[in-house]
């Protein structure tokens, strides 16, 4: 997996974890979430913490001993409006995202396959888990089909408010979708809240399609590159997302924003940008934050690097995520910093949510393999690059 991200289940007995990534390198596969029940052993029975070992106690408390992976599935009639042919063996999600005329939203359910982990003494080979089951006809839920796509869907980002919804980078196609569960119903049909749900329900929003013209970034007079600028992806010559990887959702007094890192090997400089979204998870605008590296980099043409003497040769860079530190450096009315105890639970987001976007502070990272000589090589470093702090002031 690229990222395992818990989202608020709204229920004391259940956990929900977005499981984005690679399905062991096998396509097609749907987007997935893990649903687990707390205080249960692998067979579903109640755990006795008085006799359980430390490992199982920890896993059971967090709902990780008893659960299943649930994949996005679409009712067959609805699916026929999204793609030309409903086929679990095809990359339907990619077809949907690349079609400029496909619906902007659709309803989906999330169903498990027949596989469920049976415990430490019943472990099977990875190939015998759910990884090959999503496309099998016999595994399709009655009246529904798993809405399979490419294995490469990298970072998700959850709504910081705690609402059960998230944005998902569709890395292979170059798109962004939103998933809104509304309110989880763990007691649907005959379950009555005493076991894992038969399915989850959600609304899916196409936030940025994988279509040329879908995204042109505002530059604020910056972002010049060889022969053009970074308002579009210069190497691909397309005004769209290309290989979006890192993703962070910021909720401020100004509204909601998504910070995106592309990982496309852009010869004209990898892009980091911020998308402004509304309450319905619709993208309203995009602004360039930074570009880095690329074989056409003017910095690399001069043989310079962030760490002196580390330049090797021109090549691609990669931004690697954004970490909010606003609450860690914020001060109280008396001028003192918040204590560790005061920053527990939702406190950090409450502090961030009380400030405007321009008052937020983030830490970012650039992986720069073209800067891997000198001290980086001498110390056996994986790659050069830099750690940087940044603020965002949109104009």
What positions do the PLM features span?
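Conserved small-residue
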Residues: 1-395
């Amino acid at each position: 997996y690229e990222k395992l991200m818990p989202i608020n289940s709204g229920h004391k007995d259940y956990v929900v974890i977005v499981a984005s990534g690679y399905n062991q390198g096998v396509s097609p596969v749907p987007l997935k979430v893990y649903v687990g029940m707390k205080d249960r052993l692998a067979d579903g029975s109640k755990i006795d913490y008085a006799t359980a070992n430390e490992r199982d106690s920890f896993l059971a408390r967090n709902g990780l001993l008893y659960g299943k992976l649930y994949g996005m599935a679409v009712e067959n009639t609805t699916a026929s409006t999204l793609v030309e042919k409903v086929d679990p063996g095809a990359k339907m999600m990619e077809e949907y995202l690349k079609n400029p005329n496909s619906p902007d939203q659709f309803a989906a359910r999330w169903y498990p396959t027949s596989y469920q982990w049976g415990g430490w003494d019943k472990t099977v080979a990875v190939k015998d888990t759910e990884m090959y089951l999503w496309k099998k006809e016999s595994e399709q839920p009655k009246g529904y089909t798993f809405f399979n796509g490419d294995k490469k869907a990298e970072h998700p980002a959850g709504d910081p408010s705690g609402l059960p919804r998230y944005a998902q980078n569709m890395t292979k196609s170059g798109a962004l979708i939103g998933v809104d569960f509304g309110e989880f119903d763990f007691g649907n049909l005959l379950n009555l809240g005493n076991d894992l749900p038969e399915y989850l329900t959600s609304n899916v929003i196409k936030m940025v399609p994988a279509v040329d013209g879908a995204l042109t970034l505002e530059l604020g007079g910056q972002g010049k590159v060889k022969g053009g600028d970074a308002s579009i992806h210069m190497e691909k010559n397309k005004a769209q997302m290309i290989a979006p990887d890192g993703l962070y959702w910021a909720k401020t007094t100004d509204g909601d924003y998504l910070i995106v890192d592309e990982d496309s090997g852009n010869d004209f400089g990898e892009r980091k940008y911020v998308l402004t979204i509304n309450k319905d998870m619709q993208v309203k605008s995009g602004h360039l934050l930074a570009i880095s590296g690329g074989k056409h980099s003017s910095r690399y043409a001069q043989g310079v690097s962030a760490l002196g003497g580390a330049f090797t040769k021109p090549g691609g860079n990669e931004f690697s995520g954004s970490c909010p530190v606003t609450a860690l450096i914020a001060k109280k009315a008396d001028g003192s910093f918040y204590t560790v105890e005061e920053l527990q639970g939702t406190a950090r987001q409450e502090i961030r949510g009380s400030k405007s976007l321009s008052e937020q502070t983030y830490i970012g990272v650039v992986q720069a393999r073209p800067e891997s000589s000198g001290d980086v090589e001498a110390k056996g470093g994986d790659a050069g690059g830099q750690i940087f702090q940044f603020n965002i002031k949109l104009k």
